[in-house]
């Protein structure tokens, strides 16, 4: 039975989803959960893309102990130097260097010949080996590269010292048979691939990223790259939870499995969804709300008699459990801290204190506190560091024959207070117009979503907003038992992100 290694790129490729902006602290929290999930490698970012990215990579590198932390880099010395600086304190570090190899990229993007591409690839890997024991080389758009030339590049970079070679389907163009065959051909043409990791990286433009990844495993790949929930640029990446469950459930066929702690999948999926603002569809395989639901009477009858009649995966095997009551208003700080550890959080004492204070406020509003309530509450408090504005209060005058009017009171970072009021086309619109007046920011609301965290009239409401200002798109999230307050919190946080990132240089984007 082969063991397939898992390379997670949620923090790099996943963050390139439109509108997704994850703060450094949020990246660290996701990284620690990925470590708990058991991924072999995690790509913390693209250190040379921006100062913010370099800081995020460095922070993740400091905190993660049991997985290899990776930074992406172009085949450029300055990129590799910055990656080395960011990863200097990592327990286990690796560089992921990439260069396009396909005819269309050579002609229109690089303006380089085959010989020049080959020489640049070897030069980059050779330079990277000065810094890193473990170096991964990706042949960008490998799936559309001539197989003879691809084999030549793979052989050359292995000889130069690459310990992993990645064969990405950069634009999600391949079919499973075609993609698997690339790996079979490389194994046949380049014997030295037996000495290194052969990795696959699939995009989902035609909806075949997971199928292609599994085909690569059949063809000889020993590492699968992807993201949690399949998030990523355009249509996204291969969903790692689907790949892992497919290998585990059908190991009789694939004769391969991973070393992931599958019971951490649900928690990891929920954390990534909350912090990115990307809602998991109900019918999403493995982690969707309906993944284990049965509505058909025939199916229900079968499941009641014998679960395996219609369930090939048990919800408990991926970490879903009954939403039992866990804490209440009489629960103490110690019990609350133990619950946070049980739920996978890694918080400093100051952060525990802040979360506990918010928990006590919630207990006064809600009779029954569940795991999901605590997850939503703590995740919503993960905005750390100074914010330009904080919401102190929101009031609304509303009736079916009057124009909705909202007034908001915001506190600036320096402690000063600003109050504004506005009328709007509905309660939420009036709140947002009042916040615009108070902050002085001109933004466009691109998307607004509201979810119920749990059930019942006193359930927490979770609001996600997406705002745009010029070319900058950000997300904000708010949680409260009052959905209008949650809406205001989400909007203010998104405005803060815009103000924080407006002066930053535009990050370099990279699609492998």
From Swiss-Prot:
Top-rank EC class of the record's enzyme: transferase
Binding site for Mn(2+): 13, 201, 203, 237
Protein keywords: Amino-acid biosynthesis, Branched-chain amino acid biosynthesis, Cytoplasm, Leucine biosynthesis, Manganese, Metal-binding, Transferase
Record flagged with keyword Transcription: no
Function: Catalyzes the condensation of the acetyl group of acetyl-CoA with 3-methyl-2-oxobutanoate (2-ketoisovalerate) to form 3-carboxy-3-hydroxy-4-methylpentanoate (2-isopropylmalate).
Residue span of region Regulatory domain: 390-512
GO cellular component: cytoplasm
Domain called Pyruvate carboxyltransferase: residue spans: 4-266
BP terms from Gene Ontology: L-leucine biosynthetic process
Subunit structure: Homodimer.
Record-linked Gene3D superfamilies: 1.10.238.260, 3.30.160.270, Aldolase class I
Recorded catalytic activity of this chain's protein: 3-methyl-2-oxobutanoate + acetyl-CoA + H2O = (2S)-2-isopropylmalate + CoA + H(+)
Family, similarity comment: Belongs to the alpha-IPM synthase/homocitrate synthase family. LeuA type 1 subfamily.
Associated pathway: Amino-acid biosynthesis; L-leucine biosynthesis; L-leucine from 3-methyl-2-oxobutanoate: step 1/4
Locations listed in the record: Cytoplasm
Taxonomic superkingdom: Bacteria
Keyword Cell membrane among UniProt keywords: no
Cofactor requirements of the protein: Mn(2+)
EC number of the protein: 2.3.3.13
Listed GO MF terms: 2-isopropylmalate synthase activity; acetyl-CoA C-acetyltransferase activity; manganese ion binding
PANTHER family in alphabetical order: 2-ISOPROPYLMALATE SYNTHASE 1, CHLOROPLASTIC-RELATED, HOMOCITRATE SYNTHASE-RELATED
CDD domains in alphabetical order: DRE_TIM_IPMS
Annotated SMART domains: LeuA_dimer
Gene name in the database record: leuA
Protein name according to UniProt: 2-isopropylmalate synthase
